[in-house]
């Protein structure tokens, strides 16, 4: 496999040096240069044609968002990994970057010592850059960066499930649960607006993200969707036609009200599962307790296997299941895990997922 050629773009000298040095320590990575603003980066991208850029958002002359806008007009443009700050403005701008097609983002560490900051950044960079290299080197880069709205329609595949308890009949779904990670904001931006306003069921979403960022994601999606989208709050009753996004850094599950009639959202500080908080497995297990034969579970783009164990529980209780296909995933990790485990009823491209969700709810 050839080296991944990376351009480092940041207006801070310290970060340009630290990121460049850390990247050079990763096997298979070649740092081809640095740039201190988007305009210089754009010139270097046209000249040197890197595979990937690490990109700061706030820069003089041309910021990271403006650079991403320009990259849309460049054939075979590089992927982008954003370096973001844990602030409201930082999260809002990061959501914009992800919607514009950035591969993922890394938080600029806020540890107690410079050494701890460097170690945290090294760990994040290594994981994301290695994943990008495996996903893109040897494939056309446009495969991972083309907006889903421009992807050509592909076939939805119905699968025979090996593990479902056939004694539990699948009925109309009364709740939809979604697990998603890397590539999620862009995928949700394309998929959720296709859900009709009269869907008539609640939708619960676990998107692997840190605190603050999930609130920005919910705000951004709410402006684009026919249904309401909000960050979930502890103790609220789930309502039809609302999508609830699990808060970053917390776990989200379903519980029963005191009278046993309503289903409530419970936000907890329970430990991470699969190194994730929020965790898809954690949510899915709880839904299985209250919606036997009446749930639809969706696994979308993301690295790792979070959601596999939880989906196994749901499928044993008669849930419908939908998996995103490999071609439309930014990272085919979570969907591959559940597909390999024989837990998916239907595999479909991103632009057909909403249609399949509606089918399980309406069963027409």
From Swiss-Prot:
GO terms for cellular component: cytoplasm. It is an enzyme of class 3 (hydrolase). InterPro entries: CheB-like, CheB_C, CheY-like_superfamily, Sig_transdc_resp-reg_Me-estase, Sig_transdc_resp-reg_receiver. One of its GO terms (biological process) is chemotaxis. Its EC number is 3.1.1.61, 3.5.1.44. One of its GO terms (molecular function) is phosphorelay response regulator activity. CDD domains: CheB_Rec (cd16432), REC_CheB-like (cd17541). Residues 174-364 form the CheB-type methylesterase domain. The keyword Hydrolase applies. The modification 4-aspartylphosphate is found at residue 56. Phosphorylated by CheA. Phosphorylation of the N-terminal regulatory domain activates the methylesterase activity. It catalyses: [protein]-L-glutamate 5-O-methyl ester + H2O = L-glutamyl-[protein] + methanol + H(+); L-glutaminyl-[protein] + H2O = L-glutamyl-[protein] + NH4(+). Keywords: Chemotaxis, Cytoplasm, Hydrolase, Phosphoprotein. It is found in: Cytoplasm. It comes from the Bacteria. PROSITE patterns: CHEB, RESPONSE_REGULATORY. The active site is at 181, 208, 306. Residues 5-123 form the Response regulatory domain. Pfam families: CheB_methylest, Response_reg. Contains a C-terminal catalytic domain, and an N-terminal region which modulates catalytic activity. Involved in chemotaxis. Part of a chemotaxis signal transduction system that modulates chemotaxis in response to various stimuli. Catalyzes the demethylation of specific methylglutamate residues introduced into the chemoreceptors (methyl-accepting chemotaxis proteins or MCP) by CheR. Also mediates the irreversible deamidation of specific glutamine residues to glutamic acid. Belongs to the CheB family. This is Protein-glutamate methylesterase/protein-glutamine glutaminase.
């Amino acid at each position: 496999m050839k080296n991944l050629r990376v351009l480092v773009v940041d207006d801070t000298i310290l970060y340009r040096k630290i990121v460049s040095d850390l990247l050079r320590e990763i096997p298979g990575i070649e740092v081809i240069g640095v740039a201190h603003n988007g305009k210089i980066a754009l010139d270097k991208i046209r000249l040197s044609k890197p595979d990937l850029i690490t990109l700061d958002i706030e820069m003089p002359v041309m910021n990271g968002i403006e650079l991403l806008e320009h990259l849309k007009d460049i054939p075979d443009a590089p992927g982008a990994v954003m370096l973001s700050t844990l602030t409201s403005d930082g999260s809002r701008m990061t959501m914009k970057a992800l919607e514009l097609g950035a591969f993922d983002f890394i938080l600029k560490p806020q540890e107690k010592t410079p050494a701890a900051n460097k170690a945290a950044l090294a760990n994040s960079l290594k994981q994301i850059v290695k994943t990008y290299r495996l996903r893109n080197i040897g494939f056309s880069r446009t495969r991972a960066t083309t907006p889903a709205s421009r992807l050509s329609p592909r076939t939805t595949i119905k699968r025979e499930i090996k593990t479902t308890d056939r004694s539990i009949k699948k009925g109309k779904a009364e709740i939809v649960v979604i697990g998603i990670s890397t590539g999620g904001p862009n995928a949700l931006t394309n998929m959720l607006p296709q859900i009709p306003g009269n869907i008539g069921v609640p939708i619960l979403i676990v998107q692997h993200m840190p605190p603050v960022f999930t609130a920005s994601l919910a705000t951004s999606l709410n402006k684009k969707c026919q249904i309401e989208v909000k960050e979930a709050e502890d103790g609220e009753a789930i309502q039809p036609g609302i999508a609830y996004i699990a808060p970053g850094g917390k776990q989200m599950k379903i519980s029963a009200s005191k009278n046993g009639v309503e289903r409530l959202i419970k936000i907890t500080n329970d430990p991470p599962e699969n190194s994730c908080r929020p965790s898809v497995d954690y949510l899915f297990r709880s839904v299985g307790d209250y919606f036997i034969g009446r749930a639809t579970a969706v696994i979308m783009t993301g690295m790792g296997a979070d959601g596999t164990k939880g989906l196994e529980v749901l499928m044993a209780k008669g849930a419908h299941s939908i998996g995103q296909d490999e071609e439309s995933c930014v990272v085919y990790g979570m969907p591959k895990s559940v597909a390999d485990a024989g837990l998916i009823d239907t595999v479909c491209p991103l632009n057909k997922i909403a249609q399949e969700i509606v089918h399980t709810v309406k069963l027409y």
